[in-house]
């Protein structure tokens, strides 16, 4: 059973997901929300290793705008995709939206399972 979920980067939709998961009893690690935002009942985790050890990693929609950094408007520092990719728990399931082909290939090369939200018919427009 998946128990630990990391929500990394993104906008207010990601915070809503984190709150809903926490309310369902999941242990939620929130990362990349350390600038100019009120977290209310959530806490932002600063230990990247702990965040990347989660069973599930939830990335934003879109995962990236530039192909190099995670979409993270509330992070103090840019979050470089390659810095995260090499440290993700290999048995984790990664979710994200509009995952670019180079990131998909890197996940596949590292044998990391992933799902793109926008590949689901009910979520794409």
Go through each PLM region and give its residues.
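Glycine/serine-rich phosphate-binding loop and adjoining beta1-alpha1 elements at the start
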Residues: 58-124
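NAD(P)-binding Rossmann-fold cofactor-contacting core
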Residues: 24-40
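Short acidic low-complexity segments
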Residues: 40-53
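Hydrophobic anchor at the start of a short beta-strand
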Residues: 5, 28-31, 114
């Amino acid at each position: 059973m998946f128990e630990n979920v990391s929500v990394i980067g993104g906008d207010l939709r990601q915070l809503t997901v984190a709150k809903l998961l926490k309310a369902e009893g999941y242990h939620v690690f929130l990362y990349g929300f350390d600038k100019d935002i009120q977290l209310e009942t959530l806490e932002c985790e600063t230990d990247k290793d702990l965040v990347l050890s989660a069973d599930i990693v939830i990335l934003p929609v879109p995962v990236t705008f530039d192909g190099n950094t995670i979409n993270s408007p509330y992070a103090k520092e840019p979050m470089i995709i390659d810095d995260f990719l090499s440290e993700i728990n290999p048995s984790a399931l990664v979710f994200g939206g509009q995952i670019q082909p180079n990131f998909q290939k890197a996940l596949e090369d590292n044998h990391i399972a992933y799902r793109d939200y926008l590949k689901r018919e009910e979520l794409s427009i």
